[in-house]
Amino acid sequence: MYKRQAFDGPEALALSTKISEEIYYSALSASCELAAEHGPHESFKETRAAAGDLQFDLWGVEPSDNQRWEALKDRISQHGLRNSLMIAIAPTATIASIAGCYECIEPQVSNLFKRETLSGEFLQINRYLVNELQERGLWSEDMAQKIKRAEGSIQEIEEIPEDLRKVYRTAWELPQRSLIDLAASRGAYIDQSQSLNLFMESPSIGKLSSMYMHAWKSGLKTTYYLRSRPATRINQTTTGPSDSGPAPEGTPSGSSPFTDEEAIACSLENPEACEACD
C-alpha cells in the first residue's frame, strides 16, 4: 500500500518473496554465528541443513542471489546452526495494535478503523488512503462520510479513480487465491509455518473445497482462521449531524439477527453444520 502496489499484483508477490528471503537469510546467518561461538544444536548432524539442503532447496526454488547463499551454506557446513527452526509467521493482532501498524501478512480488512484512547473511541480512516486522496484533490468531509457509510470500502465510490480503488481493496474484496499464492511463494523461505487467515463473506462447501484444495496443492503446511461475515450487515455507524438522515437504501435498520456461526450453519450449502439437515 505504501508503495502503491495492489496486494494481488506481481510486484507485491515479488516484494513479499524478497522480504521472506532476506528474513530467512538473516536468521540463518545469525544462527550460524551463534553456532560458531557456542556450538550447533545437538541434532544438527541429523538435519537436511547439515547435508547442504535449506528450505528453498526442498521446495525446488532458486534464490535471488545464489552466490551469497552458497557462501552461507559453506559457513553452515563448517559451524552448523544453533537453532533447528528459524522462521514462523504468527498472528500479531495485539502487537500490531500497540505498534500502530497492520497485522502480519494480511491485507487490511477495512479502510476504517476504531481506535480506543483515554478520551474514548473514535473512527480513523486509513492514513495512506487519506494522503492519496489529498494529493489528488479528492479529500473532503463529504468523502470521509462516504467512506464511513460504506464501512471502510471504497469500491462503490465513483469519485475515487479505479487505480486507487484497486490498491485499497480490503481482504473481503481480494481474491483469496492471491493470498494463498503469496503464502506459497513465501513458503520456500519459511521452515516452520505461517498463520494465514482467509476471508470469505459467504462460505459454501464448493468455495471452501476449491480454496483449501488450492492451498494444499500449493504446498502450504497450514492455514489459520477462516474469517466470515453474517448474512446481514450491521447498522451503519453515524458520525455527526450530516449522517442524521435515513440510512442508505438497502441498509438494515438494526443489528444482524444472526451470529457468524449461525449465518454459515443455516446455509443450504453447508448441511453438515445444521442439525435439521441430518
Describe each model-derived feature in a short phrase.
Residues 1-2:
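Short, small-residue-biased leader/transition segments that mark boundaries at the very start
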Residues 8-20, 109-120:
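Short beta-alpha connecting loops at secondary-structure transitions
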Residues 16-31:
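Short amphipathic alpha-helical coiled-coil/interface segments
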Residues 28-75:
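Short glycine-cluster motifs
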Residues 36, 40, 62-66, 75-82, ...:
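Catalytic alpha/beta core of large soluble enzyme barrels
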